[in-house]
Amino acid sequence: MRRLLAWSFLVIGAGLGATPAGRYIVYPTVTAGADLRFPRDHGAHPEHRTEWWYFTGWLEDEQGKPLGFQITFFRSRPATDPDNPNAFAPNQILFAYSVLSDPSTGKLIHEQRVARAGFGLAGAATADANVKLLDWQLERGTDGVFRARVPAGSFSLDLTFKPTQKAMVNGDQGYSRKGPKPEQASYYYSMPQLAVRGTVVKDGRSVRVKGRGWLDREWSSTLLDPKAVGWDWAGINLADGGALMLFQVRGRGGDALYAGGTLRRVDGSKVVFGPNDVRFVPRRRWRSPATGALYPVEAEFVVKLPEGERRFTLIPLFDAQELDGRAAGMPAYWEGAVSTNGGRGYLELTGYAGDLKL
């Protein structure tokens, strides 16, 4: 879903600051042969059209009650005139989303922020992860621990994310195809098995929490094929210490335009999945009373491994994890906490409340 939100608010910003005779920027193309380096690639890549820092995971409070969470910071570069002298021209736009899934209420609560970079209000550093957006902040300390602080009206999160493993580089050394054309790709790595600690403030109560998280980092300029109408993605922290990322990009009629993923085993060895190695199989659907969308909230990702086929059945923490952003000019989608045989993680389902317009 982070892809859809990134492109949605990018389109909103694209018309700002351009002039009729203006010269539009040319974005760099994502190509094979990536050489990802850290901590540099934890930081922003402002020359590319869009990127995100996407945290998800499962938390438990002091009574052992589960919560799901998502914190995502986006950076986008609108296609505006680079010679525009107007200080208010949006050369970079920052957007962030925070979501809490609470099975005790069976509801999602969410908050968001958006601002153009500059004026001391918003910005994303390039040397390391350090993103500021109004009163929200994401930063990586010298000890390698990420911290996200997202105070909001209905709830607040203050969480630290301590890496327990090295980054999982997806695709071909970080070059991750998302479509049939080679330029339909991103630079992409994940940081699974993050040790999460912090506080959740909800209904006026501050609760200590801990759990396991996942960070997805992607940046790109041309991501999806024009025939794409949606996608299904999962990031799973496996109970044995391994990690699994799988995705399918759908065309009209539900056919798979492209698919892929990564399995990192507990010994550190990796299996990189190609388009013919991954299938997404819906098992049970839930209809949203708000949008009427029919989501495959219980499904299987079927993968081909060297030792044979394996099925990962995804079960939602609860069904009603749809986020309806239509009132704010955003799409409706489903993104929620799920469990599987031998793991926990997050599933995103897009394009079920209407075809994506990218």
Describe these PLM feature segments.
Residues 1-4:
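Positively charged n-region of N-terminal signal peptides that target proteins for export
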Residues 6-15:
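Bacterial N-terminal signal peptides
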Residues 19-358:
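Structured soluble/peripheral alpha/beta segments that form catalytic or ligand/cofactor-binding pockets
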